[in-house]
């Protein structure tokens, strides 16, 4: 398989999995077993494509918030998004400096996929018994910020899965409202994470040699696919539960745990 086709597939995979509650990190690690491992810079660029995708998909919502800060509800919402991001940034930096992160290898990812799928089924069942609410509380904002850190510590957890369901359990029980808030918090979080990673790479001597055609193709693929996925998901969860994603995670995690010993042998 050519490097260009491999880059295209990895870009599509990033766009497909970044915003679905199934773990983009886990899927990229799995794909790299067959498509080859790419540089950290390549992975940052395709995530940048996902960032652009969500900004485009939510552009109307972002514009409404930006131009409506004179309204109390909009100011309150933006402030809670900011607090959630700051919690992630501060706690995440402490965790990173302390070195608290599992290695990005297939076995912990497989367990995270499996356990995360079970967690999703249980969490949505419990949240389904709560009164339907779409108001973001301070408790939800802080918890979402912490949940993003947890997702960073345990590769394969999925940022969207951990944050959406903790928000639902703590009172933001309407699925679409929880996803909307989580995606809003995800925008500055992903920007900051990518910027920090680029800065660290620069300090370590630069970005190395890249095939820029591969990088460009992957970026565009991640952007287009991510845009479609965000639009589809926000429409889908208005009428459907997350069950299909939970079952998919359980099946994939179990399959990986069965495959790994055979592959090692």
UniProtKB/Swiss-Prot annotation:
Catalytic activity: di-trans,octa-cis-undecaprenyl diphosphate + H2O = di-trans,octa-cis-undecaprenyl phosphate + phosphate + H(+)
UniProtKB keywords: Antibiotic resistance, Cell inner membrane, Cell membrane, Cell shape, Cell wall biogenesis/degradation, Hydrolase, Membrane, Peptidoglycan synthesis, Transmembrane, Transmembrane helix
Compartments, as annotated in UniProt: Cell inner membrane
Gene Ontology biological process: cell wall organization; peptidoglycan biosynthetic process; regulation of cell shape; response to antibiotic
EC number: 3.6.1.27
Keyword Hydrolase among record annotations: yes
Family according to the record: Belongs to the UppP family.
Cited function: Catalyzes the dephosphorylation of undecaprenyl diphosphate (UPP). Confers resistance to bacitracin.
Entry protein name: Undecaprenyl-diphosphatase
Organism of this sequence: Xanthomonas oryzae pv. oryzae (strain KACC10331 / KXO85)
